[in-house]
């Protein structure tokens, strides 16, 4: 294999472009490129048998459940996922209403309908609201550190704990109530771990935390499943663009590769697949999850990535947030119940204890969201993040179901509560092409690392020598961890290529 690579030319035919990964970033890039006549030589290489990546809707329990992405966060006109979903007719009337689009949530999770304590009693919702108000006011205060070069303490978790200790000095209740307040706050810490996709808020950097941008709009779901969005994008692509069950082994770049069907032409990139197939290209857009990068950093690129990009991949955080769906024949909750909180009275955010994975992994579960009732079943969706979530993946379905049945019987104070009829769960950490859920800015990293991850290669590339481009939620500095961040990143790299090959190109969608 020769190195150096001449400037790629494809007179009259346009460049050959490969997209690695068929998630929302890869599909968004492909859809945008396919609308331009210069990009007729385009393939999307998807490792699995389905498109969508971390968008994964499954028909189960007599309805559709979201094993992956759940909500459109900030469904309003500034959100491209909302725009596309509205254009394709995939949203309900309430989500489309102007009133819903104008609601400012601050990105905070709403209050529960009911809160159960581990002693089997209901927790006062007034007390829950008081603690939520304190917690989210402190979360909002973290934005004050956005421009700080250095912060003490360095993490969001340590900052929150420091402030909570200060507030505790003014608490006048009895010791039991103070303990319950701390237990509620511990639940809210765990909620924030799910939101951030991290094991602990002590791992999340304080200074850049406020750089994440919250869009207006009350989070909404897709009545027929999030995958309807990726299905619609897929339907707009030429039929030969998607190549399924084609995991990539190594991306060879900065070379000079030839192909028998194109004599006399050289390509700077060669994508080698696990099955031995090789695809030469002028450009490759890599959209694989950061968790996959971390796992395969030493073998996925040849030559290896520049040190600066390797360091960015290592420093940016990438954690696990899983869901556990429980199906019941009859609901034990009230008809208007939307969210059940679970509070463990022996837990406190101020106590740094090693996770008790074997015996208490379920204590990290934040509670359950009530899904709209299906035809013949009633379903709860629980969320759990971090090492406990990853440990849960190693257990059998029977073990998980048994543990959660015991939890529900304990917190409701009803030892006769019927066990769930069935269960479904996500296992994103053990998914080989994902290795987790989504990214966060970890202690020791910053938004600059996400920008470094997004930079194409070679870094000094001029003209059509631009070879390897990067997209995916972890490459978006302000919308990381979201589907709209992923989609925008795919559009960004498509625009980069269109500008390269046709500087006068008219953009088919607003460049948000």
From Swiss-Prot:
UniProt GO cellular component terms: cytoplasm; peroxisome
Subcellular location: Peroxisome; Cytoplasm
Top-level division of the source organism's lineage: Eukaryota
Cofactor stoichiometry and binding remark: Binds 1 FAD per subunit.
Cofactor(s) in the UniProt record: FAD
Reactions performed catalytically: N(1)-acetylspermine + O2 + H2O = 3-acetamidopropanal + spermidine + H2O2; N(1)-acetylspermidine + O2 + H2O = 3-acetamidopropanal + putrescine + H2O2; N(1),N(12)-diacetylspermine + O2 + H2O = 3-acetamidopropanal + N(1)-acetylspermidine + H2O2
Span of the annotated motif Microbody targeting signal: 510-512
An example Gene Ontology molecular-function term: polyamine oxidase activity
Residues that hold FAD according to the record: 25, 46, 54, 70-71, 248, 473, 482-483
Protein EC: 1.5.3.13
GO biological process, alphabetically ordered: spermidine catabolic process; spermine metabolic process
Top-level enzyme category: oxidoreductase
Quaternary assembly: Monomer.
Note: Oxidizes N(1)-acetylated polyamines on the exo-side of their N(4)-amino groups. Plant PAO oxidizes spermine on the endo-side of the N(4)-nitrogen.
Family named by the database record: Belongs to the flavin monoamine oxidase family.
Record protein name field: Peroxisomal N(1)-acetyl-spermine/spermidine oxidase
Provenance organism: Bos taurus
